[in-house]
């Protein structure tokens, strides 16, 4: 059932409480008008957190709980709104599907879903009500305070008595509503059953009794007789403990809080804590001992457990033996020399300066190239505790900084949780998938990460739950990401980015031989001489059954072959596997099925209008044939582009065509026979099911257009890549290593690259560079001379 909601400022109505509310805001007036039309005259009153806000738009600006009330009378103040008298019925939650307040009416559900009391609970509530009555009776006799309603409350039934006692007496001296009063009333409404409601009201009345210094003179005197006058704090604690013990005895559940407090105090004394943390821990322990409800004590104990379980001074011992670290990394990971060298640099500096702040390294590369496993191996090599936090899909800032203790079920953020798990202040902390964080109305987690990853700030990292500054300066942070462009710029500025490119076929083969097969054989309890994978067999699997940048699919395919082999062995009647069985193409096809992938190969025959371009893909690189044809059968002047090309590549076609038109005579096109107004040009890039984008095909498209219009073929052993400018300059491109390797694999032995990409050739394996001719060009004139000869 839906009810209108009325958003109030600093007004929280308790059940059975009658109060008058002035209504003036437009949405509030709409809610009253809607409630007037209903037979029940019921409306939900819920208070906003910030009383200075004029218009509330989101539910997170409201308190979590409200009150269903019945409107008893309405006075129309005309232009100034309404004055309404309401009576509280029950505490309710609003069911909202959206975070934005976009309606007047909403569904609701009761906070107390089962109002029926057991006999045990009724006995306990009677005892609590007796204590409430004693407190009210003593307070009403205090010389500075006069309560006229106290005697009227005595005759009420027990549920009304407790609620109205709270409504009457939980306030300030001058009866004005304060922030604390609002929070106290909200706390009462949040209780899920009547027993907890009564316990909470008793607890709050105790606080009022102490905070307003209205303890009865006789009680003061009794306590003073028992305890020395110099220990007023102990007097107060003793009084509250004794009162609470009476209630607990009636509930039949005396807790072991004293035992827990002794253990916590001993732990505080044993640990080496910073002075501010120790002081905070002792203060919270005092609150724990004096807590009036089991709910409050459990919250405080949970906080103390987190505070004391965090490593504040405990430090692990790092392995500073450079040679052993290098050996460990080489044994576990093939290649990736840049990362290994950076780790050794850090260790060398750490040996000179033990107080050196840890580096913040971000490994960027395609999925499956070993980023996470490499960080794990680094932690093992350095003898560091390892903590991993996955940031993929994190969209709430509180996931990083934690929730404030005022929230129900509050917990620290992932950083503090990770440090607790590590148990030392100098672990290796992996922030996995840092490029996958997103932001929404709950905050930007990337902004919270700025403090974590800034060496100048993370010495004083602040978690909303812990509330004490925590030193992260000794942590060695490492991060991983798939896409550099998706990392927020402010974070990139704090990271040392090392890019991991996709593995070449040869690197995949070596990884399979050195790591994957060894692990697979070990898991299968298989001897290495039972099944032999030759280099040719591994190359066949890599080229025809995987298409990836890393080696995850290769690992799965190798495991599939081994499992099939073992099953076949058990089917053998003799149950004996042959020794030295070599895996060949026939066996691979038998176990893995027909070939799944094939890389593009160069054309064997030369045809005008076809040029080998070069593509950089998520799985490495590939040859990218560019096809151009022209005809005079159409209207003329039309350009057709096919092959699933994205915006940038379409623009490359336009730039290439514009450049060719402006320089047709220069590049051997007979403009007397070929009129651009009379011909239609068709540019096509095969594999139309795959989207293609980027400017790097510019010179290949230009060459294909010239080849088609001049009817001069381009040799198939040549491929090219580079951006074309309107003035003919050749621009820099990316993915040089992957493109060169894929072209070489396809049979190309001559490659044209922009001169600005020369620096990236050092990443290409030497055996390829020794067997291929690289042309470095600055202007398209040089490309034309290489392809068609001197003009």
Curated annotation (Swiss-Prot):
Active site: 696, 739
Membrane-spanning segments: none
Segments forming domain Lon N-terminal: 3-209
InterPro entries: AAA+_ATPase, ATPase_AAA_core, Lon_bac, Lon_bac/euk-typ, Lon_lid, Lon_proteolytic, Lon_Prtase, Lon_prtase_N
Subcellular location: Cytoplasm
Binding locations of ATP: 365-372
Coiled coil: none
Keyword Nucleus applies: no
GO terms (BP aspect): cellular response to heat; protein quality control for misfolded or incompletely synthesized proteins
Induction: By heat shock.
Residue ranges of every copy of the Lon proteolytic domain listed in the record: 605-790
UniProt cross-references to PROSITE patterns, sorted A to Z: LON_N, LON_PROTEOLYTIC, LON_SER
GO cellular component entries: cytoplasm
Keywords: ATP-binding, Cytoplasm, Hydrolase, Nucleotide-binding, Protease, Serine protease, Stress response
Family: Belongs to the peptidase S16 family.
Subunit: Homohexamer. Organized in a ring with a central cavity.
Designated name of the protein: Lon protease
Organism, as annotated: Ureaplasma parvum serovar 3 (strain ATCC 27815 / 27 / NCTC 11736)
Biological classification of the source: Bacteria, Bacillati, Mycoplasmatota, Mycoplasmoidales, Mycoplasmoidaceae
């Amino acid at each position: 059932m839906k009810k209108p909601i009325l958003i109030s400022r600093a007004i929280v109505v308790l059940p059975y409480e009658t109060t008058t509310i002035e209504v003036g805001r437009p949405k509030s007036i709409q809610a009253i008008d809607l409630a007037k039309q209903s037979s029940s005259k019921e409306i939900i009153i819920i208070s906003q957190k910030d009383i200075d806000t004029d218009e509330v738009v989101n539910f997170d600006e409201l308190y979590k709980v409200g009150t269903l009330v019945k409107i008893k009378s309405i006075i129309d103040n005309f232009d100034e709104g309404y004055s309404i008298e309401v009576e509280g019925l029950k505490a309710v939650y609003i069911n909202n599907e959206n975070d934005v307040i976009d309606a007047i009416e909403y569904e609701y559900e009761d906070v107390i879903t089962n109002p029926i009391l057991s006999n045990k609970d009724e006995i306990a509530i009677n005892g609590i009500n007796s204590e409430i009555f004693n407190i009210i009776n003593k307070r009403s006799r205090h010389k500075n305070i006069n309560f006229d309603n106290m005697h009227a409350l005595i005759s009420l039934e027990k549920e009304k008595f407790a609620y109205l006692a709270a409504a009457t007496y939980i306030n300030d001296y001058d009866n004005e509503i304060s922030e604390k009063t609002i929070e106290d009333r909200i706390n009462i409404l949040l209780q899920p059953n009547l027993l907890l409601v009564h316990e909470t009201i008793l607890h709050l009345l105790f606080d009022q009794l102490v905070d307003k210094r209205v303890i009865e003179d006789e009680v003061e005197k009794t306590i003073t007789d028992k305890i020395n006058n110099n220990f007023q704090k102990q007097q107060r604690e003793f009084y509250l403990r004794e009162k609470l013990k009476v209630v607990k005895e009636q509930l039949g559940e005396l807790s072991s809080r004293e035992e827990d407090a002794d253990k916590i105090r001993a732990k505080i004394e044993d640990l080496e804590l910073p002075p501010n943390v120790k002081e905070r821990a002792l203060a919270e322990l005092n609150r724990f001992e004096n807590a009036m409800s089991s709910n409050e004590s459990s919250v405080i104990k949970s906080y103390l457990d987190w505070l004391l379980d965090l490593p504040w001074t405990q430090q692990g011992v790092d392995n500073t033996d450079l040679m052993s670290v290098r050996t460990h990394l080489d044994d576990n990971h093939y290649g990736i020399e840049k990362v290994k060298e950076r780790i050794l640099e850090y260790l060398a500096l750490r040996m000179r300066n033990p107080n050196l702040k840890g580096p913040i390294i971000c490994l960027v590369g395609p999925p499956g190239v070993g980023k996470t496993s490499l960080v794990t191996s680094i932690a093992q090599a350095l003898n560091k505790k390892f903590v991993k936090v996955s940031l993929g899909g994190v969209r709430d800032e509180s996931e990083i900084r934690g929730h404030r203790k005022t929230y129900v079920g509050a917990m620290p953020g992932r950083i503090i949780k990770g440090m607790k798990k590590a148990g030392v202040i100098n672990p290796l902390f992996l922030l996995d998938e840092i490029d996958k964080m997103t932001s929404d109305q709950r905050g930007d987690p990337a902004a919270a990460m700025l403090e974590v990853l800034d060496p100048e700030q993370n010495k004083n990292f602040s978690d909303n739950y812990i509330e004490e500054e925590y030193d992260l300066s000794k942590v060695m942070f490492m991060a991983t990401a798939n896409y550099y462009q998706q990392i927020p710029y402010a974070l990139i500025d704090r990271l040392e980015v090392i890019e991991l490119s996709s593995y070449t076929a040869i690197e995949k083969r070596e990884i399979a031989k050195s790591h994957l097969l060894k692990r697979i054989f070990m898991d299968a309890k298989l001897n290495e001489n039972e099944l032999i994978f030759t280099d040719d067999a591994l190359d066949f699997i890599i080229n025809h059954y995987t298409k990836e940048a890393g080696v995850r699919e290769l690992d799965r395919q190798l495991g599939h072959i081994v499992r099939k082999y073992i099953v076949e062995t058990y089917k053998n009647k003799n149950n004996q596997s042959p020794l030295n069985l070599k895996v060949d193409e026939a066996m691979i096809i038998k176990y893995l099925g027909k070939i799944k992938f094939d890389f593009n190969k160069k054309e064997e025959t030369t045809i005008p209008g076809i040029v080998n371009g070069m593509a950089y893909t998520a799985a490495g690189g590939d040859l990218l044939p560019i096809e151009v044809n022209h005809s005079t059968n159409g209207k003329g002047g039309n350009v057709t582009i096919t092959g699933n090309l994205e915006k940038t590549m379409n623009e490359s076609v336009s730039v290439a065509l514009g450049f060719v038109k402006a320089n047709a005579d220069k590049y051997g096109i007979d403009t007397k026979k070929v009129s651009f107004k009379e011909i239609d040009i068709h540019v096509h890039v095969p594999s139309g099911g795959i989207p293609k984008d980027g400017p790097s095909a510019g010179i290949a498209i230009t060459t294909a257009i010239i080849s088609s219009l001049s009817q001069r073929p381009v040799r198939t052993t040549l491929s090219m890549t580079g951006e074309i400018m309107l003035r003919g300059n050749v621009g820099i491109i990316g993915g040089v290593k992957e493109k060169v390797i894929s072209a070489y694999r396809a049979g190309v032995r001559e490659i044209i690259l922009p001169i600005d990409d020369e620096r990236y050739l050092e990443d290409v394996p030497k055996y390829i560079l020794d067997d291929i001719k690289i042309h470095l060009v600055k202007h398209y004139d040089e490309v034309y001379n290489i392809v068609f000869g001197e003009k």
